[in-house]
From Swiss-Prot:
Protein EC: 6.1.1.19
Gene source species: Shewanella sediminis (strain HAW-EB3)
Main localization category: cytoplasm
Annotated protein name in UniProt: Arginine--tRNA ligase
GO MF, one annotated term: ATP binding
Amino acid sequence: MKSHIQSLLIQALDALKQQGVIPTDFEARVQVDRTKDKTHGDFATNLAMMLTKVARKNPRELAQLIIDSLPQDSQVAKVEIAGPGFINFFIDENALASQLMAALNDDHLGIQLPEPQTVVVDYSSPNLAKEMHVGHLRSTIIGDSVVRALEFQGHNVIRQNHVGDWGTQFGMLLAYMEELRAENGEQAQMELSDLETFYRAAKVRFDESEDFAIRARKLVVSLQSGDEYCNKLWREFNDISLSHCHDVYERLGVSLTRKDVRGESTYNDDLEQVVKDLDAKGLLSESNGAKVVFQDEFKTKDGDPLPVIIQKADGGYLYATSDLAAMRYRSNVLKADRALYFVDLRQGLHFQQVFKLARTAEFINPDMSLEHMGFGTMNGDDGRPFKTRSGGVVKLVDLLTEADTRALELVRSKNPDMDQAELEKIAKVVGISSVKYADLSKNRASDYIFSFEQMLSFEGNTAPYLLYAYTRVAGIFKRATDIDLSDAKMQLDHDKEKDLGNKLAQFGEVLSRMVTKGQPHALCGYLFELAGAFSSFYEACPVLAAESEEQKKSRLLLSQLTAKTLKQGLDLLGIETLERM
């Protein structure tokens, strides 16, 4: 409906241009917002006040001219001027009911599907040298929820798990694996069942033994030179490491698969060409033996030029080099219209520099959008990045296990007579959903305090609250199995019916914001408000005990659309719904 109002206003502006009220070459940005106070209508625009200078008219006078130029439309009940020149639109209730019925009968809930784009989404991307830890949670689940929403809108989404599967640390790890195999044979592979322990043990050997360190450095050279033995060990290590990652993805309900993995090593053969191409364009400089690029807009705190290091003095490449190669691949091979990078906010400067350089070097299509979807950190009670009590890194799998355990206690306390198998099934959904939703419901650009107590609460904007809200709505239909809704019509007579209907109609707008700005918290906030609107409706408007059969069926339709919207919204967040809690 919002886009429909915008379309009407654009037609009015075209008419005013023909009348000479505003210049024909003037392009106005038509902004329409939902009103908070329904006495001021359903939608409002400040367009008249925005045009007052160019039209040289009083904003209220101009607002009236805009209203007079609006085409007749059955979906708009009336239009009024308010205050200094706001234009308020009141939507016809029958039109709203028709819109909701269309949404109920549509797999996409009646949303306006945009022109499909090819969107590359770079997310999760852990280093394969260690097990996934809590620091990988945000990129993984925020990225996955936006991917789901993009696909729901009909876009061609290409997932890219840009894992860290290359670098000097792999020489250390391969040397340690080689050492263990010399001592224990093939059983040494079992040591990798705990990647953190394996990595720490390899690091200790590297720091304490010069001979080991020398072997590790030689293995790096051999690996980079394509040595078959080193590459075989490296592939085995990566395969085991990736298995750990995908076990975590499965527990999280994340849609990443092995075919989405395209690690740093994928671009090894392209890095030399990146350097040559930058040099051919006259962009490279030398600084202390390294090959760098200086860009005028990037300075240090002291005002000195801030370089992008492309190749180290020893010939090694850096993240910037592989990122540039990846951007060129995503533009030229994958033909991406957009590339979204779900990476920690602290990498913001890095992405500003490489995005700018990719354009300057003409590595990407000039129309391609590069977007860093940065996020804050998950912190403990002390406001610092989440750690174990001993100060160590928290493995993501350990966090999820504790969430399952706490959720089981919670569900058992609510359902003491439920059998163990069902308790565990429900607790698994509640535990994982609570961790995911607690993160997704926060503005991704903000840090937040991790709290099991808050995320497992049945009060407030939490997963348990929304999961219960869904079961409450779905439960109505368990008591209405014999009611035929095929000929039912939706009526919005009560204020609470209208409030719920208006909230349901906002789903498409919220989804658009989520995929445009990469903000799952917008969808979380909407679902929480929708659950609240349904609760108010349910208390004020009896459904199964309605005054008439016609009213009962109408309210069942509203309830059905609410359940469908809650379920779809939670699914886009990667959260499974329950029929019973």
